[in-house]
């Protein structure tokens, strides 16, 4: 058998509108349960929904950002099923006339650039939230019921978990660029379900599709897909097709667990939402939105390469995160050194971000202070070792590095007579190293430079020490 994997994603994104999708209730995370509710989002008889125009605009922005076709007219539908978080007994969504269709995301880190098609992006309302307390009871919070969502459905074009993760990360960053959602998986504003099965390229054999829910982090998406891929491969090797089912990822056991047999579309008994009339979207409105879209990662990457003369790899990393790209441009504006700004950000700064286990947006250090540090280093007012030490201190404290290095006496010594005196002392104290250098062992120069730096208490210029040692010998 020549087994291949098929992976598709269904991604829900909560939109950052001020109010809910079909009523005037506030759209706010973390409020007292059941305070942001009204007869409309609770489904009381006679309460009529009305479309949130800002949510519609945000959905069109998303569609355009993923190169989708935007419908000029659409209707809303009722998706009917019984579950405690669905207080009305149905969800207002779109079944057969989605707002956006035929988009794509291009993956960059595959062996070659690969387009993953986006089948559709449709608008809908979110459901309530189940809260399980310590007593074993389940309580319902309907603050989330009616919050505007877009559901982004990909085609099953991904062939391994790495591609699926890259697709999800690329999608999240593009949504963040649009500023239509904070896309925080930890708060549920970005949620992902995955569909996976395997097939044999040499026959018509294929396993039945599994849908995995309860994926609340990029790590859980990757782990669930790796597990399911192995499970489906094993089924195929045993010539079994498995069951079409919905599963969930269990963090404790690091496995997927069956929740229920997967429902077919007609189980939901879709019907037209009669309380919301068909909506018409003028092409001029779509064009106006398109014209005002922010600069997206791909466009910004090209600009960074052309304007700042940095290489493609650095430009790609810098522009994947909108906050990082903005931060970089602020640093460049002050430091007037695009290359060194890129080197510091992608090197020592991101290293501190990773070591502190935070997001780049949570960093305290201002762009202004980082730029000042870069200028101090580039002007040789402090050496590289001192600059790195100051950065580690400044990362969390966010102080002015110019003031700090003066107060701490860290400015680099530029008195040639003093530097020569230190070199003379070190050379006199290390005759064996001098002999090694004269015998062709250049590594000993590094040792002598280190001794000079030690005597200067880190304030000397290592390049200058290197030159003076060679002249002395």
From Swiss-Prot:
It comes from the Bacteria. SMART domains: GatB_Yqey. It is an enzyme of class 6 (ligase). It catalyses: L-glutamyl-tRNA(Gln) + L-glutamine + ATP + H2O = L-glutaminyl-tRNA(Gln) + L-glutamate + ADP + phosphate + H(+); L-aspartyl-tRNA(Asn) + L-glutamine + ATP + H2O = L-asparaginyl-tRNA(Asn) + L-glutamate + ADP + phosphate + 2 H(+). Coiled coil: none annotated. Its EC number is 6.3.5.-. Transmembrane segments: none annotated. One of its GO terms (biological process) is translation. Keywords: ATP-binding, Ligase, Nucleotide-binding, Protein biosynthesis. GO terms for molecular function: asparaginyl-tRNA synthase (glutamine-hydrolyzing) activity; ATP binding; glutaminyl-tRNA synthase (glutamine-hydrolyzing) activity. PROSITE patterns: GATB. Belongs to the GatB/GatE family. GatB subfamily. HAMAP family: GatB. Allows the formation of correctly charged Asn-tRNA(Asn) or Gln-tRNA(Gln) through the transamidation of misacylated Asp-tRNA(Asn) or Glu-tRNA(Gln) in organisms which lack either or both of asparaginyl-tRNA or glutaminyl-tRNA synthetases. The reaction takes place in the presence of glutamine and ATP through an activated phospho-Asp-tRNA(Asn) or phospho-Glu-tRNA(Gln). Heterotrimer of A, B and C subunits. NCBIfam families: gatB, PRK05477.1-2, PRK05477.1-4. This is Aspartyl/glutamyl-tRNA(Asn/Gln) amidotransferase subunit B. The lineage of its organism: Bacteria, Bacillati, Bacillota, Tissierellia, Tissierellales.
């Amino acid at each position: 058998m020549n087994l291949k994997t098929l992976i598709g994603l269904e991604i829900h994104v909560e939109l950052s509108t001020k109010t809910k999708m079909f009523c005037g209730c506030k759209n706010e995370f973390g409020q007292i349960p059941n305070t942001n509710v009204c007869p409309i989002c609770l489904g009381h008889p006679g309460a009529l929904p009305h479309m949130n125009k800002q949510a519609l605009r945000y959905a069109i922005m998303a569609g355009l950002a993923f190169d989708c076709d935007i419908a000029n007219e659409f209707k809303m539908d009722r998706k009917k099923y019984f579950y405690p978080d669905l207080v009305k007994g149905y969800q207002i969504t779109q079944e057969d006339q989605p707002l956006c269709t035929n988009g794509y995301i291009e993956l960059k880190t595959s062996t070659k650039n690969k387009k993953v098609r986006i089948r559709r992006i449709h608008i809908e309302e979110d459901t309530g939230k189940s809260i399980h307390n310590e007593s074993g009871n389940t309580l319902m919070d309907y603050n989330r019921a009616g919050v505007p969502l877009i559901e982004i459905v990909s085609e099953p074009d991904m062939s391994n978990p790495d591609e699926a993760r890259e697709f999800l990360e690329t999608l999240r960053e593009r949504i963040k660029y649009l500023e239509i959602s904070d896309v925080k998986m930890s708060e549920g504003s970005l949620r992902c379900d995955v569909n996976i099965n395997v097939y044999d390229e040499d026959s018509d054999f294929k396993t039945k599709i599994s849908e995995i829910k309860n994926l609340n982090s990029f790590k859980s998406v990757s782990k669930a897909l790796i597990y399911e891929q192995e499970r489906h491969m094993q089924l195929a090797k045993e010539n079994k097709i498995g069951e079409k089912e919905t599963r969930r990822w269990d963090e404790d056991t690091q496995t997927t667990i069956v929740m229920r047999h997967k429902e077919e579309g007609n189980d939901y008994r879709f019907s037209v939402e009669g309380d919301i009339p068909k909506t018409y979207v003028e092409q001029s409105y779509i064009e106006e939105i398109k014209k005002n879209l922010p600069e997206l990662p791909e466009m910004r990457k090209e600009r960074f390469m052309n304007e700042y003369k940095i290489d493609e790899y650095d430009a790609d990393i810098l522009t994947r995160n909108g906050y990082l790209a903005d931060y970089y441009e602020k640093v460049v504006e002050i430091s007037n050194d695009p290359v060194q700004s890129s080197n510091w950000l992608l090197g020592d700064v991101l290293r501190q971000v990773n070591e502190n286990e935070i997001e780049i947006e949570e960093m305290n250090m201002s762009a202004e202070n980082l730029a000042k540090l870069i200028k101090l280093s580039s002007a040789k007012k402090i050496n590289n070792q001192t600059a790195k030490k100051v950065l580690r201190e400044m990362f969390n404290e966010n102080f002015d590095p110019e003031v700090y290095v003066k107060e701490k006496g860290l400015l680099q010594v530029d008195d040639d007579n003093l530097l020569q005196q230190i070199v003379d002392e070190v050379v006199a104290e290390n005759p064996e190293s001098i002999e090694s250098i004269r015998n062709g062992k250049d590594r000993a120069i590094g040792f002598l430079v280190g001794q000079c730096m030690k005597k200067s208490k880190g304030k000397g210029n290592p390049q200058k020490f290197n030159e003076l040692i060679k002249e002395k010998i």
